[in-house]
Regions:
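Intrinsically disordered, low-complexity repeat and linker tracts
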Residues: 1, 13, 502-509, 513-516, ...
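C-terminal segment of classical bacterial N-terminal signal peptides
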Residues: 15-25
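A contiguous strand-loop segment
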Residues: 28-151, 172-301, 306-309, 314
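Substrate-recognition/cap regions that form aromatic- and gly/pro-loop-enriched pockets
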Residues: 337-460
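Histidine-centered catalytic/metal-binding microenvironments
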Residues: 432-501
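Proteolytic cleavage junctions
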Residues: 502-508, 512, 521, 549-550, ...
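Proteolytic processing hotspots in large secreted/extracellular or virion-associated proteins
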Residues: 502-503, 529-570
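C-terminal membrane-anchoring or membrane-association module
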Residues: 643-657
């Protein structure tokens, strides 16, 4: 998933806030299981939607004619004034979605059914290599004379509101990308009761869609994955070609752009092309860790050699819904590794802390256009949130699944699941099994009770709400039990806060704060705020949601990498300098201060100057003793502003790696 937020800043760099809960760019993981490989003969596919913590997701129902014929929808995610727009040629179809709660940044409807039996799951973010982008760049607003191309923020809304089946959806996207361009690279899935298509959008105008075979499975985190394809010319449409076997729909210049970029792996004369080799960017370690663990989830004997992974995989295992649920929770156990959510390196798991929701579609053998299947949805992290069956024609979800609050709220499935996860992270070994055991027991029962045949809208709504309420009660039980054990844990045990930074705070990666037992009644994180002046800034202790911690009972031990700051460095609690020493290439100091200013410089008087500059911080600290509530601050906007300055034009937020 990608998200783009454009902001007018002025001197907003001074407001930059980057916390230890850094945003994850490029982190979604998709999966497709062909019907020949499943235990019940169904087709299964879905995705984890990953970006960041404290980002609410809700289930929605959009009624027929929400958008009238002749009415336009506009994408504001990249440029509010010059974004992609689509004008409906007919009133929009009724559709469901799993949506963001900040429409001012874009629709991001992500996944859903429509009344015609179409299913859309969009998108897994990816990016092409620099060579092909130099030939056919993304239509991302860099050229201000052209409207921005289509993005993840609006594509699902346009497709579900407009298209009747999977083939038509692919053709619609092909036409839009060919004529209006794409602002970003993406992988996506559209399906109906008869067929499933997987599509990759590579550059500003190049794409390939493949009708998915029934005897394969695929795992696709953030990259392009289609390997060698035979793109023959069967039928030539105005904006795309259809292969002679009907298996591919592709852009007319798919060979030419790669050839002009000198990246073509293949032969245009024989119509063979290795799309991964020709168009994909470098494979990231965090992508490799997820594709390897994901493949082994369904093919335990899989082995890997090099960085090329066949998109179409075989297995002798008969795969179940439970297996796919487990896939969304995979934390590299099958690779005998311990996952690391923060570094986003080779230990980054599918089941990471940045998952905002996960959805799995189950298309049974009995599927029809009127009743194409079931969506299993876990709002919040599936590590703590049970999957619940949602039906194509239901009219509403439970209020807790539709609660659009952007602050912590116990009457929200998303927020309750994430609050539970935050506590688990302090003692995963002991606390995660509590959630896992209860969730597995519930889901096993729910899978048995799910209905895969036609129901009335009233019946479907009632069944979903009954199951969703039961899942919510289970989540509340998990939250209550873990909260009690968590509070006992931080009261009776020391723990260490580990900081992992990004961009401006990347040099601070490896910073730690050692917290003695019973130091505070809340779990704490380290937040770093670089100031506009180079080499200065603040260290702040915050709770799960970025709210400042007002005091601690014990002295904490801070350890800051010396490589993060150059020259003479001083740390201050208000006006008072904190004595520090260098140990193992870290500045180490002890203090009860929860807000610390730092100043790096070579001048002898730098420490004195910093003390004067920090007097304002003392005043603020005195005034800031109000009780901290569980509330999401405006840190998302501040981060967006800071990264906008760094990028000079805009900040691009991308889902799950």
């Amino acid at each position: 998933m990608k998200k783009t937020v454009s902001v007018l800043l002025g001197s907003a760099m001074a407001l930059m806030v980057v916390t230890s809960q850094v945003m994850t760019a490029y982190a979604c993981t998709g999966v497709i299981i062909g019907k020949d490989l499943t235990e019940d003969g169904s087709t299964i596919f879905g995705r984890t939607e990953d970006l960041e913590v404290n980002h609410n997701k809700v289930y929605k129902v959009h009624e027929e004619a929400e958008y009238k014929a002749g009415e336009s929808i506009k994408d504001v995610s990249v440029n509010p004034d010059n974004g992609y727009s689509y004008t409906f040629t007919h009133s929009s179809y009724r559709y469901t979605s799993v949506s963001d709660t900040t429409p001012e940044y874009g629709y991001f409807d992500e996944a859903g059914f429509n009344e015609k039996g179409l299913i859309a799951d969009m998108t897994v973010s990816a990016s092409a290599n620099d060579e092909v982008l130099s030939v056919d760049p993304y239509v991302d607003g860099t050229d201000t004379t052209k409207p921005v191309g289509i993005t993840e923020a609006i594509i699902t809304t346009a497709v579900l509101g407009n298209c009747e089946n999977a083939r038509q959806a692919v053709e619609f996207i092909a036409d839009e990308v060919a004529t209006k361009g794409a602002a970003e690279g993406n992988g996506l899935v559209v399906a109906d009761s008869k067929e499933l298509w997987y599509m990759e959008i590579y550059t500003g105008h190049q794409f390939v869609a493949m009708k998915y075979p029934s005897d394969k499975f695929s795992v696709f985190p953030n990259s392009f994955w289609l390997n060698e394809c035979n793109l023959t010319v069967g039928e030539e449409k105005e904006n795309y070609n259809v292969s002679s076997d009907g298996m591919y729909i592709y852009s007319k210049d798919i060979f030419k752009v790669a050839s002009d970029a000198k990246t073509l792996k293949g032969d245009e004369a024989s119509r063979n092309i290795d799309l991964y080799g020709s168009y994909a960017g470098e494979l990231r370690e965090s992508t490799e860790s997820r594709v390897c663990s994901g493949i082994k989830q369904f093919k335990p004997d899989a082995s890997f050699d090099g960085k090329v992974y066949p998109f179409l995989q075989d297995t002798t295992k008969k795969i179940t819904l439970s297996d796919v649920f487990a896939f969304t929770r995979n934390r590299l156990e099958n690779l005998d590794k311990v996952a690391d959510d923060m570094s986003r390196g080779d230990l980054y798991p599918i089941g990471n802390r940045n998952t905002m929701e996960a959805h799995i579609y189950h298309i049974p053998k009995t599927a029809t256009a009127e009743y194409p299947g079931t969506m299993w949805l876990a709002l919040g992290s599936p590590l703590t949130s049970p999957f619940v069956a949602y039906y194509p024609n239901q009219t509403a979800g439970i209020p807790e699944a539709q609660n659009e609050s952007n602050e912590f709220n116990e009457d929200s499935v998303y927020w309750l699941a994430m609050d539970t996860l935050f506590m688990i992270e302090y003692n995963r070994e002991q606390l995660q099994p509590i959630a896992t055991e209860k969730i597995n027991a519930l889901e096993s029962e729910e899978i048995k009770n799910a209905v895969t045949t036609m129901m009335s809208a009233e019946e479907a709504t009632a069944l979903n709400q009954k199951d969703a309420k039961k899942a919510l009660e289970t989540l509340k039980e998990i939250h209550s039990e873990i909260k009690e054990k968590f509070q006992n844990y931080i009261k009776e045990n020391d723990y260490t806060i580990h900081f992992s930074g990004k961009r401006a705070t990347a040099p601070f990666t490896g910073a730690e704060v050692r917290v003695p037992k019973d130091s505070a009644e809340v779990g704490m994180k380290l937040q770093i705020k670089p100031a506009e002046e180079e080499g200065s800034g603040e260290l702040q202790l915050v709770d799960f949601y970025g709210n400042p911690v007002t005091e601690v009972k014990q002295e904490l031990t801070y350890s800051i990498p010396t490589s993060a700051l150059s020259g003479k460095v001083a740390f201050f609690d208000g006006e008072q300098e904190i004595a520090s020493e260098v140990k193992d290439e870290h500045y180490v100091f002890n203090t009860k201060a929860v807000k610390i200013s730092y100043k790096a410089g070579s001048a002898e008087g730098s420490a004195e100057t910093t003390a004067e500059e920090s007097s304002a911080a003392t005043q603020e600290k005195t005034e800031n003793q109000a009780e901290s509530s569980k509330k999401v601050p405006n840190s998302v906007l501040l981060i967006g502003a800071a990264l906008f300055i760094i990028a000079a034009v805009q900040m691009r937020r991308k889902k799950s790696q």
